[in-house]
């Protein structure tokens, strides 16, 4: 082609000497690029680990830059590896890994990650629960097109309300088909969002009915099923209740087919203040009519009631399937003190 001829002469094929000279000329810039990329990588890893120092939006920008750093390090490796190494099996392995990594980096930079599983819909309804204060959970019901494959109770999705913010993970807080369909036959699903971070604190003021929403998913296997030979124990704290709301909806008589393989369960729910908890009345109602039965036990922090791994082990001796969704500290405590025979299933949204 004309491009090859411009680079390598009229024949369009680089003589071996010219190719080696070209690689030799690249060695100095490749060395500098690799060195600076390595320093940037160390700094970005440190910032990623120290998440409290960085809000989500700047962290996301740094995260999106990771593929560029990988490509710089790949160039560094390709140019500086000894020529003799490329003829050895180790060189073939390195070349294959670098090629696959570079392809993945370019795929990410092009914005194609999760694209096939992304569905564009709109907000069907939005309301602030409880007293309507800025710290209360937000219920968002989304209407999705026919391309949405449906979900299973307990799954989550990545949701984008604002293109500048990117995707955020939220649990789907409704059972399949429990909300019916929109006016044009759209599938409806519910999100319950607690204003905890710099992004979610402003959603209640920014979301509007009819606003576009992109949902990628669904993902996850947090189905609360477990083995019939084990006690099924659910532990929820705060907004970690949302997957269990979906699981409980699936156990209602009107949608009993969604819980055909379910077993009786015992739900331990931890709340800061039971009297003002906007999710608790619905939780009690769902537990009262669930089939198979779900026994509810509430721990009110305002009354000094705390759930501990030791108390849980005493109440549920023997093998159990423990399903947990809530603050990382409580999850770590349950994991660290897990009694023999516990099988811990843990929902975690520590994405950074």
List the predicted regions and their residue ranges:
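Ferredoxin-reductase
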Residues: 113-214, 232, 264-266, 270-273, ...
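FNR/FR-type flavoprotein reductase catalytic core
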Residues: 1-109, 180, 186, 195-352
């Amino acid at each position: 082609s004309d491009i090859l001829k411009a680079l390598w002469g009229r024949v369009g094929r680089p003589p071996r000497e010219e190719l080696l000279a070209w690689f030799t000329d690249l060695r100095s810039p490749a060395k500098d690029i690799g060195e600076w990329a390595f320093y940037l990588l160390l700094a970005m890893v440190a910032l990623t680990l120290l998440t409290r120092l960085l809000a989500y939006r700047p962290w996301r920008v740094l995260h999106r830059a990771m593929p560029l750093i990988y490509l710089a390090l790949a160039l560094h490796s390709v140019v500086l590896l000894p020529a003799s190494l490329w003829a050895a099996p180790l060189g073939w392995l390195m070349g294959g890994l670098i090629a696959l990594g570079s392809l993945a980096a370019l795929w990410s930079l092009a914005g194609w990650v999760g694209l096939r599983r992304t569905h564009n819909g709109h907000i069907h309804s939005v309301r602030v629960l409880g007293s309507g204060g800025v710290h209360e959970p937000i219920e968002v019901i989304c209407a999705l097109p026919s391309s949405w494959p449906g979900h299973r109770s307990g799954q989550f999705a990545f949701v984008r309300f604002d293109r500048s913010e990117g995707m955020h993970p939220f649990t789907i807080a409704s059972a399949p088909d429990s909300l019916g369909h929109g006016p044009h036959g759209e599938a409806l699903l519910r999100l319950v969002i607690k204003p905890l971070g710099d992004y979610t604190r402003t959603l209640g003021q920014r979301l509007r009915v009819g606003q576009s929403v992109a949902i990628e998913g669904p993902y996850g296997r947090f189905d609360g099923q477990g083995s019939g030979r084990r006690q099924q124990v659910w532990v929820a704290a705060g907004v970690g209740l949302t997957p269990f709301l979906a699981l409980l909806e699936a156990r209602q008589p009107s949608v009993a087919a969604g819980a055909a393989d379910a077993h009786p369960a015992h739900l331990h729910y931890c709340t800061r203040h039971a009297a003002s908890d906007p999710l608790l009345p619905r939780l009690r109602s769902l537990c009262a009519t669930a089939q198979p039965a779900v026994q509810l036990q509430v721990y009110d922090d305002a009354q000094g009631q705390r759930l501990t791994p030791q108390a849980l082990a005493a109440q549920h001796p023997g093998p159990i399937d423990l399903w947990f969704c809530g603050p990382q500290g409580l999850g770590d405590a349950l994991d660290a003190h897990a009694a023999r025979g516990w099988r811990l299933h843990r929902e975690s949204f520590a994405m950074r």
